[in-house]
Each structure stands twice: as C-alpha cells, then as structure tokens.
Amino acid sequence: GVQTCALPIYFNSEKAYDMLKKLNINPNDKLKTMSKGTKEKVQLILVMSREAKLYFLDEPIAGVDPAARDYILNTILTNYNEDATIIITTHLISDIERILDDVIFISHGEIALEKTVDEIREDEGKSVDSLFREVFKC
C-alpha cells in the first residue's frame, strides 16, 4: 500500500484531478470496478497530491504491469514536493534504481547496508540490483 505522513497535510485537489484526467480515470468511478493497476495509480495520485514533508511508499510497483510501473515511477518523480523525503520499500530494485539517491538494505530488522547509489557503483563496482541480489542471495 501507499502511505504518507505529515502534520498538517494539505491536499491539492486540482493536482489530483489533473493527474486523473491525464490517465483518463473518471473520478466518479468506484474503486471496486477498477483494475489493480488503476487502483494503484489512484492511490498514488491521492498521495502525491498531498503537500507532505515525508512520503512513505510501501511496494508501490508490486503486482502491476510494466506500463503501470513506468507511470507510477514517473508520477513519483514529477509530482512530489522537492523539499520532501520519499522512502520506498521494494523488492523490485531494478525497476526503481534510476530514481534512487540513497539505499538502505534491511535484513531481519537490522541495517545490512547504507550507502548512496553513487557509492555503491564506485565502491562495489556494480548496480544496486546486483548488490541486492548478492547480499540477499537472490
């Protein structure tokens, strides 16, 4: 699921309606009639329309088709508050690696690695996805 944290939270309905329109999603449609990918997009639109200092996105691209993944990642990149921090939990590292600045690997509740993407590439000589697979034996 997608969540956000901030007090107070300001919701920009104009931004939300604009994103819905770009995707040809009728704001009057019921969620139960939408596909999983469309529901994920609507959830993300609702989150990214908030003016928050911290966005927590829990597996935002899990279980959606590649086109929906691209839309979700582009929505994250183009609609968040630039003064905000975005925390993304995911197992789909290769799909989000291009948008990452910093990486934390957590194993059994402990931090296994904490580096910038550039440090991983320079120090380890590999992609974040390759290092993830190595650390977690995927």
Label each PLM-derived region with a short phrase.
Residues G1-L7:
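Short, small-residue-biased leader/transition segments that mark boundaries at the very start
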Residues Y55-E59:
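Catalytic Walker B motif of ABC-type/P-loop ATPase nucleotide-binding domains
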Residues R69-E82:
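Helical segment within the ABC ATPase nucleotide-binding domain
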Residues A84-L92:
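Conserved H-loop
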Residues I96-R98:
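A short, surface-exposed alpha-helical micro-motif characterized by mixed small hydrophobic
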Residues E114-K115:
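ABC ATPase "signature
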